[in-house]
Design a protein with these regions (language model features):
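Short HxH-centered metal-ligating active-site micro-motif
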Residues: 35-63
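Charge-patterned, long linear interaction tracts outside catalytic cores
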Residues: 114-160
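Gly/Ser/Thr-rich loops at beta-strand to alpha-helix junctions
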Residues: 2-3, 53-62, 74-78, 122-124
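Long, charge-dense
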Residues: 60-113
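Two-metal-ion RNase H-like nuclease active-site motif
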Residues: 1-7, 13
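Short beta-strand elements
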Residues: 11-19
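Structural motif
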Residues: 13, 48-49, 68-70
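Nucleic-acid-processing active sites and adjacent nucleic-acid-binding tracks
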Residues: 19-45
Length: 160
């Protein structure tokens, strides 16, 4: 875990799928290690069931989902290391909020391997949704697409 001290911007990508087809995408820019991810997300989200690739974006900028969400982690975060990094760099409530989510992750088994979820949906429904989008890996396609697009945008921004 590396602290970047609120330097620079990172892309926040939201994908919209119709079945297995990418229907639309929106991109916003958030401050690295900032506190604007929630506001940016609220401007680019469609308000449907949302799968999040974790809750931290652009370092320790974060979104605590409010409704109709599935937070997905491919691996269980090292809670001790995350808490240590949060305490070392932030004197606000983000540590408590982030740790509150990470401590409530539930391990599920999928046909592609284990995932860790935090959701306000019925766990069986969340699993069904996640597995419905697993095509070539344990990461659901909406998350996989957003990750690939976000990396490409980030690399392009670094070169410009």
């Amino acid at each position: 875990l590396r602290y970047k001290g609120q330097r620079g911007k990172a892309p926040l990508v939201v994908t919209l799928f119709d079945g297995m087809r990418l229907k639309d995408l929106r991109i916003g820019l958030i401050t690295v290690d900032g506190r604007d991810a929630r506001d940016v997300f609220s401007q680019i989200n469609w308000g449907v069931i949302t799968m999040y690739d974790g809750i931290t974006f652009g370092g320790f900028n974060y979104i605590i989902p409010e409704r109709n969400f599935i937070v997905v982690y491919g691996n269980k975060p090292n809670l001790e290391e995350v808490e240590k990094a949060l305490r070392a760099h932030f004197q606000d409530d983000r540590g408590r909020e982030i740790m509150g989510v990470l401590e409530r992750l539930t391990r599920i088994e999928t046909r592609w391997g284990p995932l860790y979820l935090y959701t306000d949906l019925d766990l069986a429904d969340a699993r069904r949704i996640v597995e419905g989008y697993q095509v070539i890996s344990k990461y659901p396609e909406p998350i996989r697409y957003a990750h690939v697009i976000g990396r490409a945008v980030g690399m392009w921004r670094e070169k410009s």
